[in-house]
Amino acid sequence: MRHNSAGRRLGRTTSHRIAMFRNMVTSFLQHEKITTTDAKAKELRSIAEKMITLGKRGDLHATRQAAAYIRDKKVVTKLFTEIAPRYTERPGGYTRIIKLGIRPGDNAPVSVLELVEAEMKPKKAAAKPAKAPKAAKAAPVAAAAAEEAPVAEAPVAEAPAAEETTEA
């Protein structure tokens, strides 16, 4: 039974898997994008988002926790000074996975894990204006369609006239 066994093993020993993900997180935060297999990308996403959350906290303990996992001090500095401030208003979901297809050599599904660049706007609790009746909305649409219809017929009427002149 697989009780309390979350995560993917990826056909590696525990030490190999941890070392691989430490390297991948370091590269991902350094380049802000990484191409890998789907399974690795899905596992890496959770680790990377935890690192960005540590960067958002910004205290000394969070810095030391991130430095214990990320292998390069310059990348830790980049995380806390450049990457984390971009996501101060975002409550999670800092990365996206884009599937690329299959890799030609071994037919493995490949995807790109990248940071989300679009700034999130907080939802406003403003009241929405009252909706107009459906009949009122349908009338302007019908009027717009009626205006477009004669425009579409005009070129059709000119085309037969052009054919008659060529025959004569």
UniProtKB/Swiss-Prot annotation:
Ranges of compositional bias, category Low complexity: 127-144
Region (Disordered), start-end ranges: 123-144, 149-168
Gene Ontology terms describing biological process: translation
Superkingdom of the organism of origin: Bacteria
Cellular component terms (Gene Ontology): cytosolic large ribosomal subunit
Gene3D superfamilies membership: Ribosomal protein L17
Keywords: Ribonucleoprotein, Ribosomal protein
MF-aspect GO terms: structural constituent of ribosome
NCBIfam families hit by this protein: L17
Protein name, UniProt field: Large ribosomal subunit protein bL17
Species this protein is from: Geobacter sp. (strain M21)
